[in-house]
Amino acid sequence: MPTIQQLVRKGRATFLKKGKAPALDSCPQKRGVCVRVYTTTPKKPNSAMRKVARVRLTNSKEVNVYIPGEGHNLQEHSIVLVRGGRVKDLPGVRYHIVRGALDTAGVSGRMQRRSKYGAKFPKTGTGKTKAVPTKNKK
């Protein structure tokens, strides 16, 4: 334990908290260009082919970014919007692509949580149709 005189001379070291998405430079999102689009396998208990892209951001930093949803239209040189948010079973992937923004298409056929995947409200053919409840006959 330090003496009071040592604390007067030196003081206590304050630890700086490390950010979770340092490549975004304190911005909510950043634009970037896909350098490589590929699939990779997750960590041990899980099994899948996760869609990932290597993106060069406008601040010239390169990051690994997860592509959420089923199917995508991304390829090399696609312009994407990147937000923070890691993928727990993919080491080194700390960012997500925003679906439905810039060159990234929304998930087609998505009915629930559409705003998270950039899916528009599905259009019905003949105006507004109401579901008629059926009565149970005993």
From Swiss-Prot:
Any one GO CC term of the record: small ribosomal subunit
InterPro entries with a match to the protein in the record: NA-bd_OB-fold (IPR012340), Ribosomal_uS12 (IPR006032), Ribosomal_uS12_bac (IPR005679)
GO MF term set: rRNA binding; structural constituent of ribosome; tRNA binding
Keywords: Methylation, Ribonucleoprotein, Ribosomal protein, RNA-binding, rRNA-binding, tRNA-binding
Ribonucleoprotein is among the record's keywords: yes
Pfam families: Ribosom_S12_S23 (PF00164)
CDD domains given in the database record: Ribosomal_S12
Residues covered by region (Disordered): 107-138
GO biological process terms, semicolon-separated: translation
3-methylthioaspartic acid, modified sites: 89
PANTHER family tied to this protein: 30S RIBOSOMAL PROTEIN S12 FAMILY MEMBER
Function text: With S4 and S5 plays an important role in translational accuracy. Interacts with and stabilizes bases of the 16S rRNA that are involved in tRNA selection in the A site and with the mRNA backbone. Located at the interface of the 30S and 50S subunits, it traverses the body of the 30S subunit contacting proteins on the other side and probably holding the rRNA structure together. The combined cluster of proteins S8, S12 and S17 appears to hold together the shoulder and platform of the 30S subunit.
Family of this protein: Belongs to the universal ribosomal protein uS12 family.
Complexes and interactors: Part of the 30S ribosomal subunit. Contacts proteins S8 and S17. May interact with IF1 in the 30S initiation complex.
Name of the protein described by the UniProt record: Small ribosomal subunit protein uS12
Organism encoding this protein: Azobacteroides pseudotrichonymphae genomovar. CFP2
